[in-house]
Curated annotation (Swiss-Prot):
<comment type="function">
    <text>Essential for magnetosome formation. Not essential for formation of magnetosome membrane vesicles. One of 7 genes (mamLQBIEMO) able to induce magnetosome membrane biogenesis; coexpression of mamLQRBIEMO in a deletion of the 17 gene mamAB operon restores magnetosome vesicle formation but not magnetite biosynthesis.</text>
</comment>
<keyword id="KW-1281">Magnetosome</keyword>
<feature type="topological domain" description="Lumenal">
    <location>
        <begin position="68"/>
        <end position="272"/>
    </location>
</feature>
<dbReference type="GO" id="GO:0110146">
    <property type="term" value="C:magnetosome membrane"/>
</dbReference>
<protein>
    <recommendedName>
        <fullName>Magnetosome protein MamQ</fullName>
    </recommendedName>
</protein>
<feature type="topological domain" description="Cytoplasmic">
    <location>
        <begin position="1"/>
        <end position="46"/>
    </location>
</feature>
<keyword id="KW-0997">Cell inner membrane</keyword>
<comment type="similarity">
    <text>Belongs to the LemA family.</text>
</comment>
<feature type="transmembrane region" description="Helical">
    <location>
        <begin position="47"/>
        <end position="67"/>
    </location>
</feature>
<keyword id="KW-0091">Biomineralization</keyword>
<keyword id="KW-0472">Membrane</keyword>
<keyword id="KW-1003">Cell membrane</keyword>
<keyword id="KW-0812">Transmembrane</keyword>
<dbReference type="GO" id="GO:0005886">
    <property type="term" value="C:plasma membrane"/>
</dbReference>
<dbReference type="InterPro" id="IPR007156">
    <property type="entry name" value="MamQ_LemA"/>
</dbReference>
<dbReference type="InterPro" id="IPR023353">
    <property type="entry name" value="LemA-like_dom_sf"/>
</dbReference>
<keyword id="KW-1133">Transmembrane helix</keyword>
Length: 272
């Protein structure tokens, strides 16, 4: 029994020594192969997403600036085009005003000349041939509608032309003028002139309103924040409006112009 106990104790010692050696070996191996845990790296997904968002934002910003710049150009050119149309209407009025007034006044002077000479000859004929065929015919025509019927009625005019040679020659020249200008009516001519002038002024007012509306749209666009900085950098400036002056720029017929526009009257005065 003593031998068996000694053997058992020796076996236990051997096992304990073996366990100690195994632990020492594990510790040595652990010191030799130390496992270092590396810090976790941020994944590439969030970085790429942030980069994509930044690029898209930059592209959208540049695109917006370019579109706004093009809008400025479009509005500015539209305002300039309507300004040009307004100035064309002003120039058209200036060009037509004098000619239109001259034509109307000459028309009236022609009518005045025709009826003035006709009236003079009528008086001379009536005084020279009272009770005769010419005087009776003229008095009858006056009762029926005046000398206008004489000039408009070819039969009556020819009858009087054959009745008196002197009066016939003068009246023949007047009838030739009437045949050349068959619708000499100064009242209608003046009415047409006034209608034309009013129409021109209405067109000018319409063009001025169109330009001012276009200029207002452009001015508001370049003065709104933050686009006023873009307009300042790119050189876009405000467009001035057209305002009607108190006195107006409409041409007026002065006494000097009225006298200059009556060449027939001047020629008659120079002859007299």
């Amino acid at each position: 029994m003593a031998v068996s106990d000694a053997d058992a104790s020796s076996v236990d010692k051997v096992e304990s020594i073996t366990l100690q050696r195994v632990k020492q070996s594990e510790e040595l191996l652990a010191q030799l192969y130390v496992v270092e845990e590396s810090p976790r790296r941020m994944g590439r997904g969030p970085v790429q997403l942030m980069l994509a968002i930044s690029v898209l934002s930059l592209v959208a910003f540049i695109t917006t600036l370019l579109m706004r710049y093009n809008a400025f150009v479009t509005m500015y050119e539209d305002a300039q085009a309507k300004r040009s149309n307004f100035e064309v209407m002003i120039q058209r009025r200036d060009n037509l005003f004098g000619n239109l007034v001259k034509l109307t006044l000459n028309h009236a002077a022609l009518e005045h000349s025709i009826f003035s000479h006709t009236s003079d000859k009528r008086k001379e004929s009536v005084e020279a041939g009272k009770g005769g065929p010419i005087g009776s015919a003229i008095e009858q025509l006056m009762k029926q509608g005046g000398i206008g019927k004489l000039l408009g009625d070819g039969g009556a005019g020819k009858a009087l032309l054959g009745a008196d040679g002197g009066f016939g020659n003068a009246l023949g020249r007047l009838m030739a003028i009437v045949e050349q200008y068959p619708t000499v009516q100064s009242a209608d001519t003046y009415k047409h002139m006034m209608t034309s002038l009013v129409d021109m002024e209405d067109r000018i007012a319409s063009k001025r309103e169109e330009f001012n509306a276009s200029a207002a749209t452009y001015n508001v666009a370049i003065t709104k924040w933050p686009w006023d900085y873009l307009a300042m950098i790119t050189g876009f400036k405000r467009v001035e409006y057209f305002h009607e002056k108190p006195a107006g720029d409409t041409p007026i017929i002065t006494p000097q112009i009225f006298q200059e526009l009556l060449p027939l009257t001047h020629s008659q005065e120079s002859k007299n």
